[in-house]
Regions:
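Intracellular loop-helix junctions on the cytosolic face of multi-pass helical membrane proteins
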Residues: 1-18, 104, 110-123, 134, ...
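Transmembrane alpha-helices of Major Facilitator/SLC transporters
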Residues: 65-72, 294-316, 327, 334, ...
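Helix-to-loop junctions at the C-terminal end of transmembrane segments
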Residues: 69-87, 181, 306-323, 408-409
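Intracellular juxtamembrane helix-capping segments at the cytosolic ends
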Residues: 134-148, 363-378, 388
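A late C-terminal transmembrane helix in Major Facilitator Superfamily
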Residues: 376-409
Protein backbone atom coordinates (compact mmCIF):
# COMPACT_ATOMS: atom_id res chain seq x y z
CA UNK A 1 0.00 0.00 0.00
CA UNK A 2 2.99 2.26 0.23
CA UNK A 3 3.11 5.05 -2.26
CA UNK A 4 6.64 6.31 -1.82
CA UNK A 5 10.07 4.74 -1.54
CA UNK A 6 11.34 4.08 1.96
CA UNK A 7 13.83 6.66 3.22
CA UNK A 8 15.82 6.93 6.43
CA UNK A 9 14.59 9.03 9.36
CA UNK A 10 17.65 11.28 8.97
CA UNK A 11 16.83 11.97 5.32
CA UNK A 12 13.23 12.61 6.31
CA UNK A 13 14.23 15.26 8.88
CA UNK A 14 16.75 16.90 6.53
CA UNK A 15 14.09 17.24 3.83
CA UNK A 16 12.43 19.98 5.90
CA UNK A 17 15.42 22.34 5.43
CA UNK A 18 13.94 23.93 2.32
CA UNK A 19 13.16 27.66 2.16
CA UNK A 20 10.13 26.99 -0.03
CA UNK A 21 8.49 25.25 2.93
CA UNK A 22 8.64 28.56 4.83
CA UNK A 23 6.72 30.21 1.99
CA UNK A 24 4.07 27.50 2.13
CA UNK A 25 3.81 28.00 5.90
CA UNK A 26 3.37 31.76 5.63
CA UNK A 27 0.61 31.45 3.06
CA UNK A 28 -0.97 28.67 5.09
CA UNK A 29 -1.41 31.22 7.88
CA UNK A 30 -3.31 33.43 5.45
CA UNK A 31 -5.53 30.52 4.48
CA UNK A 32 -6.48 29.59 8.03
CA UNK A 33 -7.03 33.04 9.48
CA UNK A 34 -10.41 33.88 7.82
CA UNK A 35 -11.89 30.78 9.46
CA UNK A 36 -11.29 32.50 12.79
CA UNK A 37 -13.18 35.58 11.65
CA UNK A 38 -16.31 33.78 10.49
CA UNK A 39 -15.89 30.51 12.39
CA UNK A 40 -14.91 30.08 16.03
CA UNK A 41 -14.76 33.82 16.86
CA UNK A 42 -18.12 34.46 15.28
CA UNK A 43 -19.66 31.40 16.97
CA UNK A 44 -18.43 32.65 20.34
CA UNK A 45 -19.70 36.18 19.65
CA UNK A 46 -23.13 34.93 18.51
CA UNK A 47 -23.42 32.64 21.54
CA UNK A 48 -22.56 35.52 23.89
CA UNK A 49 -25.12 37.66 22.03
CA UNK A 50 -27.84 35.14 22.91
CA UNK A 51 -28.45 33.40 19.57
CA UNK A 52 -29.73 29.80 19.57
CA UNK A 53 -27.67 26.76 18.60
CA UNK A 54 -29.72 26.33 15.44
CA UNK A 55 -29.15 29.98 14.46
CA UNK A 56 -25.41 29.62 15.03
CA UNK A 57 -25.40 26.48 12.90
CA UNK A 58 -27.31 28.17 10.08
CA UNK A 59 -25.00 31.21 10.24
CA UNK A 60 -22.24 28.82 9.26
CA UNK A 61 -23.93 28.44 5.86
CA UNK A 62 -21.64 31.24 4.65
CA UNK A 63 -18.96 28.55 4.49
CA UNK A 64 -20.87 26.99 1.57
CA UNK A 65 -18.83 29.14 -0.83
CA UNK A 66 -15.79 26.98 -0.02
CA UNK A 67 -17.69 24.05 -1.53
CA UNK A 68 -18.28 25.83 -4.85
CA UNK A 69 -15.10 27.85 -5.30
CA UNK A 70 -14.03 25.48 -8.08
CA UNK A 71 -16.64 27.25 -10.23
CA UNK A 72 -14.47 30.37 -10.48
CA UNK A 73 -11.12 28.63 -10.01
CA UNK A 74 -10.46 28.70 -13.79
CA UNK A 75 -10.31 32.49 -13.56
CA UNK A 76 -7.56 32.25 -10.93
CA UNK A 77 -5.65 29.95 -13.29
CA UNK A 78 -6.01 32.15 -16.36
CA UNK A 79 -6.92 35.80 -15.65
CA UNK A 80 -4.00 38.18 -15.12
CA UNK A 81 -4.92 41.00 -12.72
CA UNK A 82 -4.01 44.50 -13.98
CA UNK A 83 -1.00 46.08 -12.23
CA UNK A 84 -0.77 43.38 -9.55
CA UNK A 85 0.24 40.59 -11.96
CA UNK A 86 3.24 42.49 -13.27
CA UNK A 87 4.72 43.06 -9.81
CA UNK A 88 3.56 39.96 -7.91
CA UNK A 89 2.93 37.24 -10.50
CA UNK A 90 -0.15 35.10 -11.14
CA UNK A 91 -0.54 33.42 -7.75
CA UNK A 92 0.54 36.18 -5.36
CA UNK A 93 -1.51 38.85 -7.16
CA UNK A 94 -4.74 36.93 -6.54
CA UNK A 95 -3.76 36.23 -2.94
CA UNK A 96 -3.02 39.91 -2.25
CA UNK A 97 -6.30 41.05 -3.83
CA UNK A 98 -8.32 38.63 -1.69
CA UNK A 99 -6.50 39.67 1.47
CA UNK A 100 -7.35 43.31 0.75
CA UNK A 101 -11.04 42.43 0.58
CA UNK A 102 -10.85 40.43 3.83
CA UNK A 103 -9.26 43.45 5.53
CA UNK A 104 -12.09 45.77 4.47
CA UNK A 105 -14.83 43.35 5.60
CA UNK A 106 -13.10 42.72 8.93
CA UNK A 107 -12.96 46.44 9.71
CA UNK A 108 -16.66 46.75 8.86
CA UNK A 109 -17.64 43.78 11.05
CA UNK A 110 -15.73 45.33 13.94
CA UNK A 111 -18.16 48.24 13.87
CA UNK A 112 -21.43 46.29 14.10
CA UNK A 113 -23.40 44.38 16.74
CA UNK A 114 -24.56 41.00 15.37
CA UNK A 115 -27.46 40.85 17.83
CA UNK A 116 -28.94 44.00 16.25
CA UNK A 117 -27.54 43.71 12.71
CA UNK A 118 -27.50 39.99 11.98
CA UNK A 119 -28.19 40.45 8.25
CA UNK A 120 -25.34 42.95 7.82
CA UNK A 121 -23.02 40.73 9.85
CA UNK A 122 -24.00 37.74 7.71
CA UNK A 123 -23.38 39.71 4.50
CA UNK A 124 -19.92 40.80 5.65
CA UNK A 125 -19.12 37.26 6.77
CA UNK A 126 -20.19 36.04 3.33
CA UNK A 127 -17.84 38.59 1.76
CA UNK A 128 -14.96 37.28 3.86
CA UNK A 129 -15.87 33.71 2.94
CA UNK A 130 -15.89 34.48 -0.81
CA UNK A 131 -12.54 36.28 -0.63
CA UNK A 132 -11.07 33.54 1.56
CA UNK A 133 -12.33 30.75 -0.71
CA UNK A 134 -10.81 32.52 -3.71
CA UNK A 135 -7.56 33.07 -1.82
CA UNK A 136 -7.44 29.34 -1.02
CA UNK A 137 -7.53 28.55 -4.74
CA UNK A 138 -4.44 30.69 -5.34
CA UNK A 139 -2.62 29.48 -2.20
CA UNK A 140 -3.15 25.80 -3.01
CA UNK A 141 -2.02 26.43 -6.58
CA UNK A 142 1.05 28.27 -5.24
CA UNK A 143 1.97 25.20 -3.17
CA UNK A 144 1.42 22.79 -6.06
CA UNK A 145 3.44 25.00 -8.42
CA UNK A 146 6.22 25.32 -5.84
CA UNK A 147 6.35 21.56 -5.21
CA UNK A 148 5.37 19.88 -8.51
CA UNK A 149 4.95 16.13 -8.90
CA UNK A 150 8.54 15.89 -10.13
CA UNK A 151 9.38 16.80 -6.51
CA UNK A 152 6.94 14.20 -5.16
CA UNK A 153 9.20 13.22 -2.26
CA UNK A 154 8.46 16.66 -0.78
CA UNK A 155 4.65 16.48 -1.03
CA UNK A 156 4.03 15.35 2.57
CA UNK A 157 6.40 18.02 3.89
CA UNK A 158 4.70 20.74 1.83
CA UNK A 159 1.30 19.47 2.93
CA UNK A 160 2.46 19.48 6.55
CA UNK A 161 3.71 23.06 6.39
CA UNK A 162 0.45 24.14 4.74
CA UNK A 163 -1.51 22.46 7.54
CA UNK A 164 0.76 23.91 10.25
CA UNK A 165 0.42 27.34 8.69
CA UNK A 166 -3.37 26.96 8.49
CA UNK A 167 -3.63 25.99 12.15
CA UNK A 168 -1.23 28.76 13.17
CA UNK A 169 -3.38 31.30 11.35
CA UNK A 170 -6.48 29.76 12.91
CA UNK A 171 -5.43 28.91 16.47
CA UNK A 172 -3.10 31.70 17.61
CA UNK A 173 -5.43 34.56 16.63
CA UNK A 174 -8.32 32.49 18.00
CA UNK A 175 -6.51 32.16 21.31
CA UNK A 176 -5.87 35.91 21.46
CA UNK A 177 -9.52 36.56 20.61
CA UNK A 178 -11.03 34.37 23.31
CA UNK A 179 -8.74 35.44 26.15
CA UNK A 180 -9.46 39.11 25.39
CA UNK A 181 -13.15 38.87 24.47
CA UNK A 182 -14.39 39.27 28.05
CA UNK A 183 -12.20 42.32 28.73
CA UNK A 184 -12.26 44.36 25.50
CA UNK A 185 -15.41 42.97 23.87
CA UNK A 186 -15.81 41.23 20.53
CA UNK A 187 -15.79 44.51 18.59
CA UNK A 188 -12.35 45.31 19.98
CA UNK A 189 -11.23 41.79 19.15
CA UNK A 190 -12.16 42.25 15.49
CA UNK A 191 -10.21 45.50 15.23
CA UNK A 192 -7.21 43.52 16.45
CA UNK A 193 -7.96 40.84 13.85
CA UNK A 194 -7.82 43.51 11.12
CA UNK A 195 -4.24 44.29 12.14
CA UNK A 196 -3.36 40.62 11.69
CA UNK A 197 -4.79 40.70 8.15
CA UNK A 198 -2.45 43.61 7.35
CA UNK A 199 0.50 41.58 8.66
CA UNK A 200 -0.48 38.63 6.46
CA UNK A 201 -0.52 40.94 3.45
CA UNK A 202 3.11 41.82 4.18
CA UNK A 203 3.92 38.10 4.27
CA UNK A 204 2.49 37.75 0.76
CA UNK A 205 4.87 40.42 -0.52
CA UNK A 206 7.87 38.57 0.95
CA UNK A 207 7.40 35.07 -0.52
CA UNK A 208 8.75 34.14 -3.95
CA UNK A 209 6.51 33.46 -6.95
CA UNK A 210 7.02 29.88 -8.26
CA UNK A 211 8.28 29.23 -11.80
CA UNK A 212 6.32 26.62 -13.78
CA UNK A 213 5.41 25.49 -17.30
CA UNK A 214 1.77 26.41 -16.63
CA UNK A 215 1.50 29.17 -19.25
CA UNK A 216 3.26 27.06 -21.89
CA UNK A 217 0.91 24.12 -21.30
CA UNK A 218 -2.12 26.40 -21.36
CA UNK A 219 -1.00 27.99 -24.63
CA UNK A 220 -0.55 24.54 -26.19
CA UNK A 221 -4.07 23.60 -25.10
CA UNK A 222 -5.40 26.90 -26.46
CA UNK A 223 -3.78 26.23 -29.85
CA UNK A 224 -5.44 22.81 -30.00
CA UNK A 225 -8.83 24.28 -29.17
CA UNK A 226 -8.33 27.14 -31.64
CA UNK A 227 -7.76 24.63 -34.44
CA UNK A 228 -11.02 22.89 -33.52
CA UNK A 229 -13.30 25.92 -33.09
CA UNK A 230 -11.54 28.48 -35.30
CA UNK A 231 -11.95 31.32 -32.82
CA UNK A 232 -9.39 32.63 -30.36
CA UNK A 233 -12.08 33.95 -28.01
CA UNK A 234 -13.99 30.66 -27.92
CA UNK A 235 -10.72 28.74 -27.59
CA UNK A 236 -9.70 30.87 -24.60
CA UNK A 237 -13.07 30.28 -22.95
CA UNK A 238 -13.05 26.52 -23.53
CA UNK A 239 -9.49 26.16 -22.27
CA UNK A 240 -10.32 28.28 -19.22
CA UNK A 241 -13.64 26.68 -18.28
CA UNK A 242 -13.82 23.22 -19.89
CA UNK A 243 -10.27 21.93 -20.37
CA UNK A 244 -9.34 21.66 -16.64
CA UNK A 245 -12.24 19.27 -16.00
CA UNK A 246 -11.71 17.32 -19.23
CA UNK A 247 -8.03 17.00 -18.38
CA UNK A 248 -8.83 15.56 -14.93
CA UNK A 249 -11.14 12.89 -16.36
CA UNK A 250 -8.80 12.08 -19.27
CA UNK A 251 -5.81 11.71 -16.97
CA UNK A 252 -7.58 9.41 -14.51
CA UNK A 253 -10.35 7.78 -16.54
CA UNK A 254 -14.05 8.35 -15.91
CA UNK A 255 -14.52 5.49 -13.42
CA UNK A 256 -11.45 6.37 -11.37
CA UNK A 257 -12.21 10.08 -11.48
CA UNK A 258 -15.74 9.52 -10.16
CA UNK A 259 -14.41 7.17 -7.47
CA UNK A 260 -11.88 9.78 -6.40
CA UNK A 261 -14.55 12.46 -6.20
CA UNK A 262 -16.82 10.27 -4.05
CA UNK A 263 -13.98 9.30 -1.71
CA UNK A 264 -12.92 12.93 -1.28
CA UNK A 265 -16.50 13.92 -0.47
CA UNK A 266 -17.02 11.23 2.18
CA UNK A 267 -13.68 11.23 3.98
CA UNK A 268 -14.16 14.12 6.43
CA UNK A 269 -17.92 14.44 6.91
CA UNK A 270 -17.85 13.22 10.52
CA UNK A 271 -15.06 15.61 11.43
CA UNK A 272 -17.04 18.43 9.80
CA UNK A 273 -20.13 17.85 11.96
CA UNK A 274 -18.00 17.71 15.10
CA UNK A 275 -16.03 20.85 14.25
CA UNK A 276 -19.06 23.04 13.59
CA UNK A 277 -20.51 22.43 17.06
CA UNK A 278 -17.28 22.21 19.09
CA UNK A 279 -17.29 25.78 20.51
CA UNK A 280 -21.00 25.56 21.36
CA UNK A 281 -20.36 22.19 23.01
CA UNK A 282 -17.47 23.53 25.11
CA UNK A 283 -19.62 26.41 26.35
CA UNK A 284 -22.62 24.21 27.17
CA UNK A 285 -20.45 21.70 29.03
CA UNK A 286 -19.33 24.58 31.24
CA UNK A 287 -15.98 25.91 29.99
CA UNK A 288 -15.31 29.67 30.01
CA UNK A 289 -14.05 31.75 27.07
CA UNK A 290 -10.60 31.88 28.68
CA UNK A 291 -10.48 28.09 29.12
CA UNK A 292 -11.60 27.56 25.52
CA UNK A 293 -8.96 30.00 24.30
CA UNK A 294 -6.19 28.36 26.33
CA UNK A 295 -6.96 24.69 25.72
CA UNK A 296 -8.69 24.66 22.34
CA UNK A 297 -6.69 27.43 20.66
CA UNK A 298 -3.24 27.87 22.24
CA UNK A 299 -2.54 24.28 23.39
CA UNK A 300 -4.49 22.90 20.45
CA UNK A 301 -2.22 24.84 18.11
CA UNK A 302 0.97 23.48 19.68
CA UNK A 303 -0.37 19.93 19.70
CA UNK A 304 -1.45 20.19 16.07
CA UNK A 305 1.93 21.50 14.92
CA UNK A 306 3.79 18.70 16.69
CA UNK A 307 1.56 15.92 15.41
CA UNK A 308 1.43 17.37 11.89
CA UNK A 309 5.21 17.13 11.69
CA UNK A 310 5.08 13.59 13.08
CA UNK A 311 2.31 12.66 10.67
CA UNK A 312 4.17 14.05 7.67
CA UNK A 313 7.33 12.14 8.60
CA UNK A 314 5.33 8.91 8.84
CA UNK A 315 3.71 9.64 5.47
CA UNK A 316 7.12 10.33 3.93
CA UNK A 317 8.53 7.08 5.25
CA UNK A 318 5.59 4.70 4.82
CA UNK A 319 3.43 6.20 2.08
CA UNK A 320 0.40 8.41 1.57
CA UNK A 321 -2.27 5.75 1.00
CA UNK A 322 -1.39 3.84 4.16
CA UNK A 323 -1.44 7.15 6.02
CA UNK A 324 -4.96 7.82 4.76
CA UNK A 325 -6.22 4.49 6.09
CA UNK A 326 -4.59 4.85 9.52
CA UNK A 327 -5.63 8.48 9.80
CA UNK A 328 -9.24 7.78 8.88
CA UNK A 329 -9.62 5.02 11.47
CA UNK A 330 -7.99 7.11 14.20
CA UNK A 331 -10.04 10.17 13.24
CA UNK A 332 -13.29 8.25 13.72
CA UNK A 333 -12.17 6.76 17.03
CA UNK A 334 -11.11 10.15 18.42
CA UNK A 335 -14.67 11.49 18.13
CA UNK A 336 -15.66 9.08 20.88
CA UNK A 337 -13.49 11.10 23.29
CA UNK A 338 -15.95 13.98 22.92
CA UNK A 339 -18.82 11.65 23.81
CA UNK A 340 -16.94 10.75 26.99
CA UNK A 341 -16.40 14.43 27.81
CA UNK A 342 -20.13 15.08 27.35
CA UNK A 343 -20.84 12.52 30.06
CA UNK A 344 -18.13 13.68 32.49
CA UNK A 345 -18.61 17.46 32.24
CA UNK A 346 -16.08 20.34 32.46
CA UNK A 347 -13.01 18.32 33.45
CA UNK A 348 -9.86 20.14 32.32
CA UNK A 349 -7.68 17.02 32.31
CA UNK A 350 -10.15 15.18 30.07
CA UNK A 351 -10.45 18.31 27.90
CA UNK A 352 -6.68 18.30 27.38
CA UNK A 353 -6.57 14.54 26.70
CA UNK A 354 -9.40 14.85 24.18
CA UNK A 355 -7.65 17.69 22.37
CA UNK A 356 -4.39 15.73 22.19
CA UNK A 357 -6.09 12.70 20.65
CA UNK A 358 -8.28 14.75 18.31
CA UNK A 359 -5.45 16.98 17.08
CA UNK A 360 -3.18 14.00 16.48
CA UNK A 361 -5.72 12.12 14.38
CA UNK A 362 -6.86 15.23 12.52
CA UNK A 363 -3.31 16.34 11.71
CA UNK A 364 -2.22 12.88 10.61
CA UNK A 365 -5.19 12.33 8.29
CA UNK A 366 -5.07 15.87 6.87
CA UNK A 367 -1.43 15.61 5.79
CA UNK A 368 -2.13 12.37 3.94
CA UNK A 369 -5.34 13.78 2.46
CA UNK A 370 -3.74 16.99 1.15
CA UNK A 371 -0.77 15.05 -0.27
CA UNK A 372 -3.13 12.68 -2.04
CA UNK A 373 -5.15 15.51 -3.60
CA UNK A 374 -1.97 17.23 -4.75
CA UNK A 375 -0.68 14.08 -6.44
CA UNK A 376 -3.71 13.64 -8.69
CA UNK A 377 -3.77 17.19 -10.10
CA UNK A 378 -2.14 18.32 -13.34
CA UNK A 379 0.35 21.16 -13.62
CA UNK A 380 -1.42 23.07 -16.39
CA UNK A 381 -4.61 23.61 -14.37
CA UNK A 382 -3.48 23.03 -10.80
CA UNK A 383 -5.68 25.77 -9.31
CA UNK A 384 -8.89 24.50 -10.91
CA UNK A 385 -8.37 20.78 -10.37
CA UNK A 386 -7.23 21.08 -6.77
CA UNK A 387 -10.09 23.49 -6.06
CA UNK A 388 -12.56 20.92 -7.41
CA UNK A 389 -11.19 18.21 -5.12
CA UNK A 390 -10.83 20.50 -2.11
CA UNK A 391 -14.36 21.84 -2.63
CA UNK A 392 -15.75 18.33 -2.46
CA UNK A 393 -13.67 17.65 0.63
CA UNK A 394 -15.02 20.83 2.21
CA UNK A 395 -18.62 20.24 1.15
CA UNK A 396 -19.58 18.35 4.29
CA UNK A 397 -17.77 20.83 6.53
CA UNK A 398 -19.18 23.90 4.82
CA UNK A 399 -22.69 22.85 3.81
CA UNK A 400 -24.01 19.67 5.40
CA UNK A 401 -22.49 20.59 8.77
CA UNK A 402 -24.77 23.63 8.88
CA UNK A 403 -27.46 21.20 10.04
CA UNK A 404 -25.32 20.03 12.96
CA UNK A 405 -27.15 22.32 15.37
CA UNK A 406 -30.50 20.87 14.28
CA UNK A 407 -29.13 17.35 14.78
CA UNK A 408 -27.98 18.15 18.33
CA UNK A 409 -31.36 19.69 19.14
CA UNK A 410 -33.17 16.67 17.68
CA UNK A 411 -31.05 14.16 19.59
CA UNK A 412 -30.88 16.35 22.71
CA UNK A 413 -27.82 14.31 23.64
CA UNK A 414 -24.25 15.37 22.95
CA UNK A 415 -22.86 11.85 23.51
CA UNK A 416 -25.08 10.28 20.84
CA UNK A 417 -24.22 13.12 18.47
CA UNK A 418 -20.49 12.42 18.76
CA UNK A 419 -20.97 8.66 18.33
CA UNK A 420 -22.84 9.36 15.09
CA UNK A 421 -20.00 11.59 13.85
CA UNK A 422 -17.58 8.73 14.52
CA UNK A 423 -19.65 6.38 12.34
CA UNK A 424 -19.83 8.82 9.41
CA UNK A 425 -16.29 8.05 8.22
CA UNK A 426 -16.88 4.30 7.78
CA UNK A 427 -18.12 4.40 4.13
CA UNK A 428 -14.99 6.20 2.93
CA UNK A 429 -12.73 3.78 4.82
CA UNK A 430 -14.45 0.81 3.19
CA UNK A 431 -13.99 2.46 -0.21
CA UNK A 432 -10.32 3.23 0.47
CA UNK A 433 -9.60 -0.33 1.61
CA UNK A 434 -11.34 -1.93 -1.37
CA UNK A 435 -9.45 0.30 -3.83
CA UNK A 436 -6.16 0.60 -1.94
CA UNK A 437 -4.12 -1.13 -4.66
CA UNK A 438 -5.78 0.93 -7.37
CA UNK A 439 -5.03 4.16 -5.53
CA UNK A 440 -1.42 3.06 -5.17
CA UNK A 441 -1.18 2.49 -8.93
CA UNK A 442 -2.76 5.88 -9.52
CA UNK A 443 -0.13 7.60 -7.39
CA UNK A 444 2.65 5.77 -9.21
CA UNK A 445 1.15 6.78 -12.56
CA UNK A 446 0.95 10.41 -11.47
CA UNK A 447 4.57 10.32 -10.36
CA UNK A 448 5.70 8.93 -13.71
CA UNK A 449 3.72 11.56 -15.60
CA UNK A 450 5.74 14.26 -13.86
CA UNK A 451 8.65 13.52 -16.16
CA UNK A 452 6.41 14.28 -19.14
CA UNK A 453 5.39 17.66 -17.71
Amino acid sequence: MSSSPTVSWRETVQSYLDRRLLWVFMLGCSSGFPWVLIGSNMSGWLKDAGLTRAAIGYFGSVFAVYAINFLWAPLVDRVKLPLLHRSLGQRRSWIFLCQSFVLICTLLIAGVNPANNLMLTSALALGIAIASATQDIAIDAFRIDTFPKSDSSKLPQASAMAVIGWWTGYSLPGYLAFINADSIGWNGVYYGMAAIVALLMIFTLLVGEPTTRREQLQQEAEQRHNQLVGSKVVAWLTVTVVEPFLDFFKRNGVRVALTLLLFVFLFKIGEAFLGRMSITFYKEVGFSNEQIGYYSKLLGWGITIFFTLVGSMINVKFGIVRGLMIGGIAMAASNLMFAWMAEVGPNENLFLATLIVDNFTSAFSTVAFVSFLTMVTGQAFSATQYALLASLGNFGRTTLASFSGELVDYLDNWSVFFVITALMVIPSLIMLYSLRHYFHDLLEKARKESSEE
